[in-house]
Amino acid sequence: MTTPKDQQHVPRPAQILFVCHPLTGHITPALRVASELHRRGWPVSFLGPTTHQHRISASGVDFIPLQDEADIDDLLYYSPDNPNPPVPWYHWKLWYERALVDVEKHCLEPIPAQWRCVKQALASLQERSPDIPTVVISEAFFHGILPLYFGAALPDGVKRPKTLCLSVTPPAIRSVDLPPFGYPLPFSQSSEGRARNAQAWDIFGEETSSLKKLFHSKLAEAGATHFPSGPILDGTNYTSHDAILQIGVPSFEYPRSDWPQQFQFLGFLPLGAPPPNGYPNLPSWWDQLTSTKKRVVVVAQGTVETDPNDLIIPTIEALRERDDVQVVAIMGRKGATLPDGFAQSRNALVTDYLHYDAVLPYAHVWVHNGGYGAITHGIAHGVPMVVAGEGQDKPENVKRVRFSGIGVGLGTPRPGIENLKISLDAVLGDARFKTRVDVLRQETEDLDCFGRVEDALLKVVAR
C-alpha cells in the first residue's frame, strides 16, 4: 500500500480552499484536516480570520485573510470584557437566546463579506494554478459559500468549484426523527414522536422567522436569485454541498432514518503526534502527575465559559476528601488563576493552560463543558466523561454523551458540588462507561478519518 509519505511529491488533481466558521472550536479541527492534506501533498489554502493567522500559517497551509465584517475575533466576541458586545446584555441572556444571536452575528450577517472573500480567493487560486481545479472544503457553519448554490455569479472566467461540507459539530440537519437543534425533546421514530418533532419544527420556524428573513436578505445582497424554503438550521448549509463529511462515528449519533444521500462519517480526528521534544511549558507539578498511583480526574473550564466557579471549583470540592483521586484542573486561558482566598485541596493540581493530548493519557475521568472538541479528545484517549455546559452546540453534545453511554451528561454550566460528586462517583465506579468509550475509540480508528477525506476529494474531482 502506498503511504501518505510516499505520495507527498505525487502531483494532486486539484488544489483545495478551506473556508471555516471563525470560531476557535471550528477552526481547530478544520485546520487539523487542512494541515494533514497539505502533509500528503495537496496544495491547500485556508480562508480564515486574522486573529488565527499565525496558527494557520504555522500549520504549513497558505493563509488567506477574511476581510471586513467577515473577520471576526471570537475570543473578543465572547469575552465579558468586550467593550462592544454583540447585543446589549448578551452575557445575561438565556443560552438559547445567545445561540440565536450567534447565528445572526457569525453565520448570517457576514454572508456578503464572506462571499466576496470566497470569490477573490477562487479567482486568485485559479490565476495561480490555471491547469488544475479548485475544490472548496467548507466547514458546515461557514454560510458565505451558500450564495454559490442560490444563483450568485462568480467573477468572469472563474470556474465553478466542487464543494465538500466538513462538519465538526453534531450534524444540524433536519430529520423526521429529531426536533430542532437544541430542543429538549428526545430522539423518537414512533409516529407520536415524529408528529411531536414536526410540530416543534413548525414552532421553531415561527420563532426564527426574523432570522430566515435576514438569511434571505443577506443571500440577496450577495447576489442570490433564489432562496431556501425551510427554516434556518434545517441543514441547507450541509445538503447544498456535493458531499457531507461528518467528523464522528455512528455510535455517537442517533440512528436516524433519513441521512442525506451524500452524508458519510469520517471517524473522529486521530491523535496528533506529540512534539519531537515533548509538550512545551508543562507545569512544575508534571512529574507528580505522571508518577501518581491514584485515579486521575481532569477538569477543564474551557475558553468560552471561563468562570472557575462554574465547573473547576465545584469539581475540586466534590473530590476534596477523596485521597484515592488526583484532580488536575485546567483554567483554559494563559495566566488564569483560581480566585484569591480559595483554599486549594491537597489532591488538586492547577494550571492555567495545558494541551489536552498531554494530560488525557493519564486520566480516568474527563470533566468539561461539553464542547465537541473536548468530547472527541476524550474518545480518542478512551476516557469516560462528565459533561456540563450549555449554549452553542453543547446541549446536543450532552444528549449524545448520554445516548452513547460514554459518560454522564449534566446539561448545565453550573452543576454544583453535589451533582458533580454523584456523577463522578458513578463514572469512577462503573466500568461500563470505560467499555463504551473504548468501543467508540475503536470505531473511529477503524474508519480512518484523514483517508476518508482524501478519498472524498478524489471522487469529487473525478466526477
For the regions a protein language model found, what residue spans apply to each?
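A donor-sugar binding/catalytic signature common to diverse glycosyltransferases
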Residues: 34, 352-400
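Long, low-complexity segments enriched in small/aliphatic residues
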Residues: 222-266
